């Protein structure tokens, strides 16, 4: 089957790559290859001795990566949460000079109706980043308990009508199992008593189900923890998030790792004991938001936040 060419405009492209502080001979990871915007820019800044390891769990992204014929570049089909395993297999633990993550769903995934990510286009109710693994959104919604669906909508979509929508989903699936995105969008819209004139009523539900089906927040947390073991001293983390749930995790991680161990005031400890606790693992270098010009050219960039941190010598 021919793969349609869906356009993808990389958000905060230069800023995210600048955040890595590229060394020509460095070793870098692009944990979310997508359509290769960040990877291609990183490669353009690497010298002959540099290396780039890219990761993506979307088979379409892996197919796109085959167009890069460069001995410094390699692509792995898998989740970025397993980056420590990929690095360990290549005996590069503690030698990585930078990790870039561009979180969430990409424009090609949203724009391709066959992937089932968008309520704006009718397609199979799938939503998997990797359609070859795990349950689709339709399969999960057909088997999940009403209370579990409500919890997911509330937790990952911050949906105030979560219980009402969950009940409507379960009732509809009892009558006729939903298999299409349009069906889910219609059920959610009908179950939503108060409409936001600036937002489709299914927006939060689709976000929540997608995050749950792909274990997105757990993936982020695991990747962040793994980064501490794989980064070299001075290595950079450059992470773009697109909604508050993602950014909250990244912000909390960078803040906690920048503070070092917290010792209660007045607790008697020797200098040797304090040393054993270790110091700060990261140094937070701040955050960036897209400028007005970028948002005008690419409205999806509006909610993006780039956070950068550097591995310390601790």
Curated annotation (Swiss-Prot):
Question: Which Gene3D superfamilies does this chain map to?
Answer: Putative methyltransferase TM0872, insert domain, Vaccinia Virus protein VP39
Provide the reaction this enzyme catalyses: cytidine(1402) in 16S rRNA + S-adenosyl-L-methionine = N(4)-methylcytidine(1402) in 16S rRNA + S-adenosyl-L-homocysteine + H(+)
Q: Give the UniProt record's GO annotations in the biological process aspect.
A: rRNA base methylation
Q: Which UniProt keywords apply?
A: Cytoplasm, Methyltransferase, rRNA processing, S-adenosyl-L-methionine, Transferase
* Family annotation (InterPro entries): RsmH, SAM-dep_MeTrfase_MraW_recog, SAM-dependent_MTases_sf
Specify the enzyme's EC class, one word: transferase
Subcellular location per the Swiss-Prot or TrEMBL entry:
Cytoplasm
Where is this protein primarily located? cytoplasm
What is the E.C. number? 2.1.1.199
The record lists S-adenosyl-L-methionine as bound by: 36-38, 56, 80, 102, 109
Q: What does this protein do?
A: Specifically methylates the N4 position of cytidine in position 1402 (C1402) of 16S rRNA.
Q: Which family does it belong to?
A: Belongs to the methyltransferase superfamily. RsmH family.
> Can you name this protein?
Ribosomal RNA small subunit methyltransferase H
The organism is Citrobacter koseri (strain ATCC BAA-895 / CDC 4225-83 / SGSC4696)
Q: Quick one: which gene encodes this?
A: rsmH
